[in-house]
């Protein structure tokens, strides 16, 4: 191959993208992956904390905890299918329990919300990660509150007490 053809080959990028575009896409994919991991891990950990509290404070055994898990999965599936939104769940919790899930989630201290995830968060992305963690906590509070109120006939006081124990 001649030198001219070799130079031309080096300039050409795969798939018609420039090197900068490829790097930008890789960075975006990496941040999306990190965000998804952060949300999933925090959701899993807050779920485990709530199960421990329901077991210790309210005497829930394996069967009732699995019923809570089943009801929450049903809510998540209907939310994913578009039949129910998290705003509707928050409204339902506000109407039935008199508790604002968003306000409760915002009462969780910023630094302590990062204890829900094992991975270290880069200092530059702390604000956005904190917002994602607060949203994850808010969504789980709404799911759990509606589940306990409708599925187990918890009183307003019991739901509020459960959310307070989860916060600490």
State the predicted function of each range.
Residues 5-50, 78, 84-145:
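Intrinsic disorder/low-complexity detector
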Residues 68-77, 162-167:
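Amphipathic alpha-helical segments that form the core helices of the histone-fold
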């Amino acid at each position: 191959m001649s030198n001219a053809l070799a130079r031309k080959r080096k300039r050409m990028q795969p798939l018609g993208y420039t090197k900068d575009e490829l790097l930008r896409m890789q960075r975006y994919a990496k941040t999306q992956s990190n965000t998804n991991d952060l949300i999933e891990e925090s959701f899993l950990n807050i779920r485990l904390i709530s199960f421990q509290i329901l077991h210790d404070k309210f005497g829930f055994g394996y069967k009732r905890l699995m019923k809570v898990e089943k009801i929450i999965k049903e809510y998540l599936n209907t939310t994913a299918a578009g039949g129910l939104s998290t705003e509707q769940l928050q409204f339902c919790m506000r109407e039935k329990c008199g508790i604002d899930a968003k306000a409760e989630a915002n009462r969780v201290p910023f630094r302590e919300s990062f204890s829900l995830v094992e991975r270290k968060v880069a200092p530059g992305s702390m604000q956005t990660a904190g917002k994602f963690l607060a949203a994850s906590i808010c969504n789980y509070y709404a799911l759990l509150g509606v589940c306990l109120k409708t599925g187990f006939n918890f009183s307003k006081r019991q739901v509020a007490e459960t959310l307070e124990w989860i916060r600490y």
